[in-house]
Each structure stands twice: as C-alpha cells, then as structure tokens.
Amino acid sequence: MEESGDTCELTIVIMTVHAVMLESGFVLFDPDSSMRFSFSKKTLVSLNYTLPSVKGIVGLNFEKEAIVGSFVRVVSIDKRSYVHIVDLLMETLKSDEEEDTLSIDCKVLVWWRMIKDGIVTPLLVDLCYKTGLELPPCFISLPRELKHKILESLPGVDIGTLACVSSELRDMAS
C-alpha cells in the first residue's frame, strides 16, 4: 500500500477494517480468480469479502472510484472521515505516560466499535439477508419498532449501560 503513494493513515484504516471484517467471519475473495483468501494484485485499496458458506460478495473501496461487478453490496470508505481518529490514536500512542494506557485502550475500543457498528455488522446482516442465510444474533437486525419496545421495558440504568455499547443504541436511548 505504501508503494501506491499511500499514507500511514490510509494503511491504518484499511488494516483496521480488514481485521474487523476477519473477526466477524468474512474472508477475502478475488472475484477474478474466484479464490478465497487472496489479495487482488490490481489494487490493495479495494478489497472484496464473502462468507465461507456464501457465493455473494461485498466490496470495500477505500478510493472514490466505483467498483464494477456482481456484488451484493459495495461500500466506499472515505479515509478523510476516519483520519482525525487515526491521528488521535497515533498521538496517544506516542505518549510515554503509563496512565495513558487506559486511554489508548479506550480509544482503540471506540475505533473498533465504530468500524464494526458502522460498516461490518450492516454488511453482514445485508449479505445474510440477501443470500438467505440466518441472520447473526444481533440487536441491529431487529425492526426499529421492536428495538424501541425493548428499550421502553428496561430500567433507566440499563438503558444508560446499553447507550455505551454502540452509536445506534446511544441514538435510540436518547
């Protein structure tokens, strides 16, 4: 990626999204050779993923140009929307103070959740829905009205705790 004029920030964004995709059960897929676990030789800023038991493909594009092909869904990730977070993480990592360790862990967790909640889980739900697979057991796959009913039945303390889990729950809890 560095050879293609990439910056450190783009590398961090791509590697983080890639790690969250793998952690969620996705595998890399090269649509040209129909091989799994393969990086495309054309470009490393457009990655294609699938699930082990699925033929559908989701594409992630880290550039502005469109991806053409037979994808279930394509997501374009604008690195500029994540660069400020990467800069914050890099700044915190440079600190030598021990008390910053908790701060670093917290920021990395927030970064991970942001990628998981905003990109990966919606892709997973969409791919499962469109290919007929059973949806993953997650709150996000429930209809909005049902989510509201569930939240209404919870005590305020529990709603406050749920609001810390994801941005979607935080928005719903407010």
Swiss-Prot record:
SUPFAM superfamilies membership: F-box domain
Name of a matching Pfam family: F-box
Residue ranges occupied by any F-box domain in the UniProt entry: 136-174
Domain of life according to the entry: Eukaryota
Matches recorded under PANTHER family: F-BOX PROTEIN SKIP22
Protein name (database record): F-box protein At1g70360
Organism, as annotated: Arabidopsis thaliana
